[in-house]
Amino acid sequence: MGIEAIKEAGVVGAGGAGFPTHVKLNVKVEYFIVNAAECEPLIETDKFLCRQWPERIVSTVVKISEMLGSTKNVIALKDHYHREIQALEDAIQKLDAPVEVFKMSSFYPAGDEQSMIYEVTGRSVPERGLPSQVGCVVDNVGTVLSIADALEGKPVCEKYLSVTGDVKQPKMYHVPLGTPIRAILDAAGVQRGTYNVILGGPMMGKTVMSEEAIDNTVVTKTTGNLLVLPKDHYLFRRASYSIPKMIHQARSACIQCKMCTDLCPRHLIGHDVKPNLVMRSVWREEQIEDNDEYIKYFGSAANCCSCGACEMFSCPMGLSPRKMNDYVKG
């Protein structure tokens, strides 16, 4: 009954991936983990939801745990989210719910599903595997509230999102799906022609870099934030680099320091991810005919989660290992 209601309501992952929730919940696991870490900077949506509806979140976690048969139910968020932690802990105590709050250190990408599973359980999801393989299901806190609505017969037809960045007053908006982002930007007082937008956060968000593109973009089930920045911002300049230019930069400037590999979150939980090897040979990727040699240099790119830590933090030369991994993955 519950799974079917979630399917009929059209619930998908609200945290960005958009995976059908009824499929994800159709398993039996030990852990149910609610992702409230708000992985990227300059996003406020998940924190807002935790403050506004802590009891609804906690009570729905209990209902979901009954579907999953989970014995350990965890809401994971960063340890400096003091107001959100207090609200959730008060709700857990009031409802006497079998749920605990897991306080994570403030690191990026704390909200990455597999990094979170490792932090909470100590288990590493197999490369290109699913959390259920290690007895876990992870859902975003926004997804949990969509499930709460679904169990009451309400389909997913609205979305909470934050508007942040270079705006006079960052705000939360509650809008119908399909709302043009232009209408939201106008409501936020954003002057036309002077700003571009990132759907999501500065690390993994999708850039919208023309007035026409802004006019043609609407709110979907996975839209969680509109990050407004000046058109000449570094993030937009970087996003405009062509693949040939980035390949040329990799060939000429990569010093093979391995920092992109050593600081890769997936590498740190034991996955085979070696962006330094991709950077070393991406210029000749189309020339490699031997399958074993190709796998040696480029096979690990399939394990990249595209978090961007390598190009925004790790690389001392300002190169783009993440983009090169994405290019190799096709």
Regions found by a protein language model. Name each.
Residues M1-D96, F102-E119, H248, N291-G330:
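Iron-sulfur-cluster electron-transfer modules
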Residues M1-G10, S162-V167, S240-P244:
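Short, hydrophobic/aliphatic alpha-helical segments
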Residues F19, E38-C39, Y108, K168, ...:
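Short, glycine-/Ser/Thr-/acidic-enriched flexible segments
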Residues T71-V74, D79-I181, A187-R192, L199-G201:
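Hydrophobic alpha-helical positions that pack around
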Residues K78-H82, Y195-T220:
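Short acidic beta-strand-loop surface patches of small beta-rich interaction domains
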Residues Y108-V138, S210-S242:
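Active-site loop ensemble at the mouth of alpha/beta enzyme cores that anchors a bound cofactor
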Residues L229-R251, T261, H267-G330:
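Ferredoxin-type iron-sulfur electron-transfer modules in oxidoreductases and energy-metabolism complexes
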